[in-house]
Amino acid sequence: MSFYLEEEVEVDFQFDYAELAQRVVDFCLDYVAFPYEAEVNLTLTDNEGIHAINKEFREIDRPTDVLSFPMLSYETPGEFSFLDDEDSDDFNPDTGEALLGDIVISIEKVYEQAESFGHSVEREYAFLITHSMLHLFGFDHMEENEAKVMEDKQKDILNKMNILR
């Protein structure tokens, strides 16, 4: 599994955020029984940085907490039988790892939301990574029934990791 972390801004978390991110990504891969080694990229930025990305790629002119850019196209969320390791579009030709996608998180939003939800910065950070990983597995929350499934999975993952509110 390849996990790449890019820091566009200074990160002043009071915990090992690289280790936590790796743990959450690994746990999510195991949770959905992802059948291949995977590649995931995480970029940590600020509100200005995520605002620019949100505007460019989603045409939404404001910062957000997390953006997910899945590289795979799913017919059914969390169902991976469509993947073919002979298909070079889905796999890194150098490593053979499935290209899951990119996660972008606003550090400022992590702090803001941790305070507003009344839980730790560490928990908010882990939640946003979990949320985004589920998007990389094809889950969404546009419809009420989809949102319920995604919320239940997020809660279950964080509870099993003992990352509680």
Where are these regions (language model features)?
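An acidic/histidine-cluster motif and surrounding catalytic segment
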Residues: 1-126, 137-165
